[in-house]
Amino acid sequence: MNNRIQDKTDELLIITAEEAGELTQACTKILRHGVDEQKIKALIEEVGDMQCMIELLIAHNMMTQEDIEKRTKVKLEKLKKYS
C-alpha cells in the first residue's frame, strides 16, 4: 500500500475513533446528568456522525454492509442472551 493511500486510511480511522469517543461522551452525559432535549439532540448528532463514518469505511472498502449486518445479528443474539 502506498503512503498516500495509507495516509487516507489512517485519517479515516482516526476520525472514526474520534467520533466514537464523542458518541461515548454524549451517552455518559445523559447517564450522569439525566435526559433532556439538548442532550438527546447531542446524542442524535453523534449517532449521525458515527453512521457517516461507517458509511465512509464501507465506501473505502474497509468492510461491507453485509459484514456489518452479520456482526449486528451476532451482537443482537448476545444481548438477548445476557439481557
Regions found by a protein language model. Name each.
Residues 1-47, 51-83:
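Flexible "arm" and connector segments at domain edges
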